[in-house]
Curated annotation (Swiss-Prot):
Annotated protein name in UniProt: Small ribosomal subunit biogenesis GTPase RsgA 2
Residues at which Zn(2+) binds: 247, 252, 254, 260
Quaternary organization: Monomer. Associates with 30S ribosomal subunit, binds 16S rRNA.
Subcellular location: Cytoplasm
Source species taxonomy: Bacteria, Bacillati, Bacillota, Bacilli, Bacillales
Binding site for GTP: 112-115, 166-174
Length: 293
C-alpha cells in the first residue's frame, strides 16, 4: 500500500501525488456506499495498479474541509476582492470571512485592481484596509498586472496549502498567473450586465507555487451559512470574540439584549458599524432560513 495526497479531482478520477510520482486513481465502491467523497487535499492510502494508475483504499482523517469549493486539509484561505470591476463590497468580503472563520482556517485578504482607482477611491480602500487590520487580519493591496507587487506575497504560500476564494472576475486566476506564469490559467471577462465574471475555473486543483500548494477554486455565485447556527455566528467575528465574555447575559446574541458588551463597543467606535450591521444581517438570514430535511 502506498500513501499520497490528492492534488486534482476530475470526472471521478483522483490524481494522487506520491513522492515524485503521480497516479490516476479511482475510489473504492465502499466510499460510494458510505457516501464518502474523496476531496482534493485528502491524504490517502492507495493500491497502485501499474506505473501510473491505482485505487484509493483509505482516506486519512481531515483537519478541515470545505463543501464549496470541495477541498480538505487547508492551512489558509486567500480571499480575493477587487477594488473595482466588480466593485469592492465589504458585505461579500465579510460573508467569505465568516465562512472561512467557521472552518478555523486562517484568512488573508487581497484587494486587487488598485491600479484602476483614482486618488479618492484608493484612500477609501485604505480606510477599509485599516479596519480589517485592526481586527487582526492580514490585508494586501495588489495589482495583478504589476509584477513588482507580487514577490512580497510569495512567503505567504511557503510550506502551506492555500485556497483562493472570491467572487469570479476579481482576479484570482490573474494573480496565480503572475505568481507562476507557466500555469497560464484562463482569466475571466467581466459581464457588463451582471457586474461579475464568468466562471473560468472548472475543477479544483492543487498547484505548486514556490514551496507551497495553491488551489484555484471555482467562482462562487451563492454563499450560504448552511452549517452555521445562530449562536455560533459571533465566533466568526474576532472583534466580538474578545468582548463576548463581558456581556451581562450568557448566550447573548448581541442583538436586542440589554448590557451587551459588543453593542457598547459599536457605540464607542471600537467595532466598525458596518461589521456589526453585517452581523445582524447574517444573523437574521440564519434565523429565518428554511430547515433542511
Amino acid at each position: 500500500m502506498a500513501e499520497g495526497r490528492i492534488i486534482k479531482a476530475l470526472s471521478g478520477f483522483y490524481y494522487v501525488q506520491s513522492d515524485n510520482q503521480q497516479f490516476v486513481c479511482k475510489g473504492r465502491g465502499l466510499f460510494r456506499n458510505k457516501k464518502i467523497t474523496p476531496l482534493v487535499g485528502d491524504y490517502v492510502e492507495f493500491e497502485p495498479k501499474d506505473d501510473n494508475e491505482g485505487y484509493i483504499m483509505e482516506i486519512k482523517e481531515r483537519s478541515n474541509e470545505l463543501v464549496r469549493p470541495p477541498i480538505a486539509n487547508i492551512d489558509q484561505a486567500i480571499i480575493v476582492s477587487s477594488a473595482v470591476d466588480p466593485d469592492f463590497t465589504t458585505l461579500l468580503l465579510d460573508r467569505f470571512l465568516v465562512l472561512i472563520e467557521s472552518k478555523h482556517i486562517q484568512p488573508i485578504i487581497l484587494i486587487t485592481k488598485v491600479d484602476l482607482l483614482n486618488e479618492d477611491q484608493l484612500e477609501n480602500i485604505k480606510l477599509y484596509k485599516q479596519h480589517y487590520e485592526k481586527i487582526g487580519y492580514r490585508v494586501e493591496l495588489v495589482s495583478s498586472k504589476n509584477q513588482d507587487l507580487l514577490p512580497e506575497l510569495e512567503p505567504y504560500f511557503d510550506e502551506k496549502v492555500s485556497v483562493f476564494a472570491g467572487q469570479s472576475g476579481v482576479g484570482k486566476s490573474s494573480l496565480i498567473n503572475v505568481l507562476d506564469p507557466s500555469l497560464l490559467l484562463e482569466t475571466a471577462e467581466i459581464s457588463k450586465s451582471l457586474g461579475r465574471g464568468k466562471h473560468t475555473t472548472r475543477h479544483v486543483e492543487l498547484m505548486k507555487i514556490g514551496n507551497g500548494l495553491v488551489a484555484d477554486t471555482p467562482g462562487f455565485s451563492v454563499l450560504e451559512f448552511r452549517e452555521i447556527e445562530a449562536e455560533e455566528l459571533a465566533d466568526s467575528f474576532p472583534e466580538f470574540n474578545a468582548r463576548m465574555h463581558l456581556c451581562k447575559f450568557r448566550g447573548c446574541m448581541h442583538d436586542k439584549e440589554p448590557k451587551c458588551a459588543v453593542k457598547e463597543a459599536v457605540e464607542n467606535e471600537e467595532i466598525a458599524v458596518f461589521r456589526y450591521n453585517h452581523y445582524l444581517r447574517f444573523l437574521e438570514e440564519i434565523q429565518t432560513r428554511k430547515p433542511r430535511y
